[in-house]
Amino acid sequence: MQALNSRSEIELLVNTFYDKVKQDPLLAPLFAHVDWPHHLPVMYNFWASMLLGDRSYTGNPFQKHMPLPLTPMHFSRWLELFNQTVDENFTGAKAEEVKARAQSIATVFQFKLNLTP
């Protein structure tokens, strides 16, 4: 296990997580048409901005997700795979922080999409 303190570790997290997503029966269809060579660097920048404060990400993540047919089950599975990936590969304060941030993002997105009771 390693800490989650550098861009290379964030890239490992993102790559490992999306490898799981691509194999997941519930989530894979949502990502079937993703341009991975373009999408992965965007995700590296997003999480590096969140965890390292490097401000490499510019964009509106919510806007990108609005047209998708998302349900609470999608968010639950996304979080399950994300947390599993973190727990299998990383330890320390940043590992806990990234899981908390993912939970917060999922909560806000579901609220904005009217997917919460």
Regions found by a protein language model. Give the residues of each.
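Core of compact, soluble alpha-helical bundle domains
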Residues: 1-117
